[in-house]
């Protein structure tokens, strides 16, 4: 009986063994997973997250390449990073470019003495380009290096060019202004802006200081001013008389009371009444003068 049971048990075990054999690999994997989970839980309870080393599935070679790439990209992005606290108290990060060389010492500015500047200026007035042995000898005498002497001459030539260009601009502007002033003064002296242009067929024959004409006996009115009177009488024509005020007169000179142009000259008798005076502008030479007597006469007539 027991033998059959054992044999039956063996047979059952033998029959079940193929089923267990199929799932043997899966069972072993589950046991391993449970073990790793238990280990992880223990490590989490005993240590903090920062102390746990991070495992990576990449190979050592690939990890080295990634580190090199990160270093190379970091070097290409910036040269140095500086944390700065502003007035509000916030901390900001300043990223300096890679090409900025902070460790390089700054170039010191050369300060020349009065004697050195005097000698350099004398040499520059003699020759603007000092090269070769002359520059070497000058640097030795002034206790300077050849580079300092060369740089000083370069800066001095640049300064001279700037001064020359500035002087030429000032000279051109001053000459243009003086030319315009001379033109205006010449026109004023000739009386072209203040006198009435005469016809081209008139020829000046004589000057009459008494204010009388010899042609038709036309009497010209005299004024209180001392300006000369110019009288021109063409042959066979009427008299033409014009009084030109001098430039040295008062600011508002007056024309004579009557300025007559006889009929044969301009085709009729034209008079400029005494109510008109010489204006201050060249474009408006005559301006009407209002007098009190005319205003009072108008009121009396009304």
From Swiss-Prot:
It comes from the Eukaryota. Gene3D superfamilies: Homeodomain-like (1.10.10.60). GO terms for cellular component: nucleus. SUPFAM superfamilies: Homeodomain-like. One of its GO terms (biological process) is regulation of transcription by RNA polymerase II. Residues 204-223 have a biased composition (Low complexity). The keyword Transcription regulation applies. Residues 1-35, 50-73, 156-175, 199-223, 282-302 are annotated as: Disordered. SMART domains: HOX. Transmembrane segments: none annotated. InterPro entries: EMX-VAX-Noto_Homeobox_TFs, HD, HD_metazoa, Homeobox_CS, Homeodomain-like_sf, HTH_motif. Keywords: Developmental protein, DNA-binding, Homeobox, Nucleus, Transcription, Transcription regulation, Wnt signaling pathway. Signal peptide: none annotated. Residues 105-164 bind DNA. GO terms for molecular function: DNA-binding transcription factor activity, RNA polymerase II-specific; RNA polymerase II cis-regulatory region sequence-specific DNA binding. Residues 161-172, 287-296 have a biased composition (Basic and acidic residues). Transcription factor that may function in dorsoventral specification of the forebrain. Regulates the expression of Wnt signaling antagonists including the expression of a truncated tcf7l2 isoform that cannot bind ctnnb1 and acts therefore as a potent dominant-negative Wnt antagonist. Plays a crucial role in eye development and, in particular, in the specification of the ventral optic vesicle. May be a regulator of axial polarization in the retina. This is Ventral anterior homeobox 2a. The lineage of its organism: Eukaryota, Metazoa, Chordata, Craniata, Vertebrata.
């Amino acid at each position: 009986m027991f033998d059959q049971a054992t044999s039956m048990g063996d047979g059952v075990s033998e029959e079940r063994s193929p089923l267990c054999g199929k799932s043997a690999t899966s069972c072993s994997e589950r046991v391993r997973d449970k073990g790793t989970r238990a280990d992880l839980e223990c490590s989490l309870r005993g240590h903090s997250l920062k102390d746990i080393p991070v495992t990576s599935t990449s190979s050592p070679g690939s990890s080295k390449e990634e580190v090199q790439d990160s270093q190379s990209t970091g070097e290409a992005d910036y040269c140095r990073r500086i944390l700065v606290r502003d007035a509000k108290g916030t901390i900001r990060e300043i990223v300096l470019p890679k090409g900025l060389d902070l460790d390089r010492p700054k170039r010191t500015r050369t300060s020349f003495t009065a004697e050195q500047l005097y000698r350099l200026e004398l040499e520059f007035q003699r020759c603007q380009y000092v090269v070769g042995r002359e520059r070497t000898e000058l640097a030795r005498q002034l206790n300077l290096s050849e580079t300092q002497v060369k740089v000083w001459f370069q800066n001095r030539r640049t300064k001279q060019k700037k001064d020359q260009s500035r002087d030429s601009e000032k000279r051109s502007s001053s000459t243009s202004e003086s030319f315009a002033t001379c033109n205006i003064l010449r026109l004023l002296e000739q009386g072209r802006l203040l006198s009435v242009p005469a016809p081209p067929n008139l020829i000046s024959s004589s000057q009459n200081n008494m204010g009388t004409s010899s042609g038709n006996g036309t009497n010209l009115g005299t004024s209180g001013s001392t300006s000369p009177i110019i009288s021109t009488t063409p042959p066979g024509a009427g008299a033409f008389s014009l009084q030109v005020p001098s430039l040295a007169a008062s600011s508002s000179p007056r024309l004579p009371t009557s300025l007559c142009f006889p009929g044969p000259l301009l085709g009729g008798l034209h008079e400029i009444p005494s109510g008109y005076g010489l204006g201050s502008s060249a474009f408006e030479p005559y301006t009407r003068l209002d007098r009190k007597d005319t205003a009072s006469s108008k009121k009396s007539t009304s």
